[in-house]
């Protein structure tokens, strides 16, 4: 789960009437997206031009550096920091250092930068560049693991240039998304598919952008749309605002991916809002980010215990945001909630032969491959799955209601999340402990 990109610039526009707020947010978001669309169109055109590898590499590096300067504060400083991460990581990767060492080194650099900014009271600058660096670190780590897997002492320019192209791809520098090395080159090498198909991609992209801007307006102007009648409603609206700002980023990047001819799915808001389980919520929140963590952290199984591997994966996810207690405690809470629910539902499914596990039985050959006595369509399974769907919706409120506007521009204090969760009697944690206890009894 991740919302690493700054959204503070739009949250400042909430005051005033609904019409004024909506207009200001729509203009601000469209201005940001239109710049990125220009980059997408430019590089869609460039990829069809037969230029040499050397020229292509220089174009990518120059344009990416310019993009970082264009979208961030302290333009030159941001470009230097961005390229410093690249130079150090690539130098270590070429020397066959482990991907884990490079990931740990980049996280250490990120935390050092955060402390430096904090010392000079520039926390807002760090928050503005954090999302860019997080995606950058993920790509650098992917390159490091690829080089480690290749295990070759002979490093040719053609191979090096392919990694540089992957790391320095301007349309994905600001909002992402993260693509694996294979996904990126599948997208880059895709041929022109004809006017009708390309027009279809453009229409889908424009629809995604329209939905993204609509959700951005609701996220920033939610108290103009809805008047909370209780504290719970206010908490639910705060959590909704956090989610919808995340959907704005995801749908925008989905539009860019579609324009460039890739079929990678970034996120489907409906699969998050109405998820079968908290496990599905986590995996659907940002699918490329989840893929990175699953492939490079969880599947490598540094520990014998599944629980330890789950919490280690969520810990790495939180550290990619820097030392952010609010994000760390939220991600670890989600990990604990998802783990306890998954264990309980797995036990419940096996004990009573019901299709109620956190993941639905797979569909093969257009038919449900379910060997349970009580399938998804039976009454008791439907009721139990509906209960967990509603519980997942509550967990979204519980974990998202801590992201209030009070400290969003400078970072949240240590006890902020605990105080807000205390107003709900730590209910999601209590439910999770109950699930763990019941899974031992059943």
Curated annotation (Swiss-Prot):
One GO cellular component this record assigns the protein to is: endoplasmic reticulum
Q: Which family does it belong to?
A: Belongs to the membrane-bound acyltransferase family. Porcupine subfamily.
Return the protein name.
Protein-serine O-palmitoleoyltransferase porcupine
Per its record, the protein catalyses: [Wnt protein]-L-serine + (9Z)-hexadecenoyl-CoA = [Wnt protein]-O-(9Z)-hexadecenoyl-L-serine + CoA
The Swiss-Prot or TrEMBL record annotates one GO molecular function as: palmitoleoyltransferase activity
Q: What does this protein do?
A: Key regulator of the Wnt signaling pathway that mediates lipid modification of Wnt proteins. Acts as a protein-serine O-palmitoleoyltransferase that catalyzes the attachment of palmitoleate, a 16-carbon monounsaturated fatty acid (C16:1(9Z)), to Wnt proteins. Serine palmitoleoylation of WNT proteins is required for efficient binding to frizzled receptors. Has a role in cell specification, specifically in blastomere signaling. Involved in cytosketetal polarity. Required for the orientation of mitotic spindle axis.
The subcellular localization recorded is: Membrane
Q: What is its main location?
A: membrane
Enzyme Commission no = 2.3.1.250
| Biological source species | Caenorhabditis elegans
Q: Which residues cross the membrane?
A: 26-46, 51-71, 84-104, 125-145, 157-177, 199-219, 247-267, 319-339, 381-401, 418-438
Q: Does the keyword Transmembrane helix apply?
A: yes
User: What enzyme category does the UniProt record give?
Assistant: transferase
When the coding gene is removed by deletion, what phenotypic consequences does the entry describe? Embryonic lethal with severely defective embryonic morphogenesis with no endoderm and excess mesoderm. In addition, embryos have defective mitotic spindle orientation in the 8-cell stage ABar blastomere.
Query: Per its UniProt record, what InterPro entries does this chain match?
Result: LPLAT_7/PORCN-like, MBOAT_fam
Membrane topology field: Multi-pass membrane protein
The protein's UniProt keywords, in alphabetical order, are:
Acyltransferase, Developmental protein, Membrane, Segmentation polarity protein, Transferase, Transmembrane, Transmembrane helix, Wnt signaling pathway
What's a GO biological-process term for it?
endodermal cell fate specification
Annotated active site residues, numbered on this chain, are: 321
């Amino acid at each position: 789960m991740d919302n690493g990109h700054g959204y503070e610039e739009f949250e400042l526009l909430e005051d005033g009437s609904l019409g004024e707020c909506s207009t200001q947010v729509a203009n601000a978001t469209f201005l940001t997206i239109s710049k990125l669309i220009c980059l997408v169109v430019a590089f869609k055109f460039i990829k069809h031009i037969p230029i040499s590898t050397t020229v292509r590499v220089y174009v990518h590096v120059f344009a990416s550096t310019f993009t970082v300067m264009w979208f961030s504060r302290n333009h030159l400083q941001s470009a230097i920091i961005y390229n410093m991460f690249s130079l150090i990581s690539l130098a270590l990767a070429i020397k066959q250092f482990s991907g884990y060492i490079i990931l740990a080194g980049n996280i250490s650099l990120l935390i050092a930068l955060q402390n430096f900014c904090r010392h000079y009271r520039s926390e807002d600058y760090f928050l503005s560049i954090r999302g860019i660096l997080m995606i950058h670190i993920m790509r650098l780590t992917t390159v490091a693991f690829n080089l480690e897997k290749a295990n070759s002492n002979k490093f040719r320019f053609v191979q090096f240039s392919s990694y540089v192209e992957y790391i320095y791809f301007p349309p994905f520098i600001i909002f992402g998304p993260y693509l694996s090395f294979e996904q990126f080159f599948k997208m880059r090498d895709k041929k022109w598919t004809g006017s009708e198909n390309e027009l279809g991609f453009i229409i889908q992209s424009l629809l995604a952008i329209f939905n993204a801007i609509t959700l951005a307006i609701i996220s920033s102007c939610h108290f103009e749309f809805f008047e909370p009648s209780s504290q719970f409603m206010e908490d639910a609206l705060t959590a909704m605002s956090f989610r919808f700002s995340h959907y704005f980023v995801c749908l925008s990047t989905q539009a860019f991916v579609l324009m460039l001819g890739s079929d990678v799915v970034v996120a489907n808001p409906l699969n998050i809002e109405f998820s079968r389980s908290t496990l599905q919520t986590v995996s659907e929140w940002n699918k490329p980010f989840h893929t990175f963590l699953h492939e490079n952290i969880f599947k490598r199984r540094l520990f014998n215990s599944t629980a330890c591997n789950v919490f280690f994966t969520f810990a790495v996810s939180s550290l990619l945001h820097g030392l952010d207690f609010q994000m760390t405690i939220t991600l670890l809470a989600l990990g604990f909630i998802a783990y306890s629910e998954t264990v309980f539902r797995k036990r419940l499914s096996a004990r009573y032969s019901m299709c109620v596990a956190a993941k639905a039985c797979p569909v093969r050959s257009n038919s449900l491959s379910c060997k349970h006595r009580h399938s998804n369509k039976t009454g008791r399974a439907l009721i139990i799955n509906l209960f967990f769907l509603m519980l997942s919706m509550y967990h979204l409120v519980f974990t998202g209601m801590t992201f209030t506007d009070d400290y969003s521009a400078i970072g949240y204090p240590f006890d902020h999340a605990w105080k807000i969760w205390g107003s709900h009697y730590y209910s999601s944690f209590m439910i999770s402990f109950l699930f763990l206890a019941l899974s031992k009894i059943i």
